[in-house]
């Protein structure tokens, strides 16, 4: 009886060890190497353009507005609202 429980415990331990080794090997292979990180960093930096503005529209706007295409709400002529809920200027 003792021999049977010893063998089942050792089999369970062996399976646990194999699973642990497999997990560690898979995790390590999923991480990029140092050389791959350097190449990726250089590739990302090649897209970087230090003399350009990010997210600003061009100054030649087809909308005919201001120089940069942005208008404040105070500059817009809203007019009267057709819903009667306000939002326009009262014209008395």
Curated annotation (Swiss-Prot):
Annotated compartments: Cell membrane; Secreted, Extracellular space, Apoplast
Residue numbers covered by motif SCOOP motif 2: 75-89
Per the record, the major location class is membrane
At which positions is motif SCOOP motif 1?
Answer: 53-67
Q: Using the UniProt annotation, give all residue ranges assigned to the region (Disordered).
A: 50-92
Q: Which residues form the signal peptide?
A: 1-29
Specify residue ranges for compositional bias: Polar residues: 53-62
- Name the UniProt record assigns to this protein: Serine rich endogenous peptide 11
């Amino acid at each position: 009886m003792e021999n049977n429980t010893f063998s089942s415990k050792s089999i369970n331990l062996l399976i646990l060890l194999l699973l642990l080794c497999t997990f560690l090997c898979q995790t390590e292979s999923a991480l990029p190497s140092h050389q791959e990180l350097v190449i990726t960093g250089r590739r990302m930096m090649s897209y970087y353009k230090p003399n350009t503005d990010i997210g600003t529209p061009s100054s030649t706007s087809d909308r005919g507005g201001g120089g940069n295409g942005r208008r404040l709400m105070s500059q817009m002529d809203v007019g009267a609202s057709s819903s009667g809920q306000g939002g326009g200027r009262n014209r008395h």
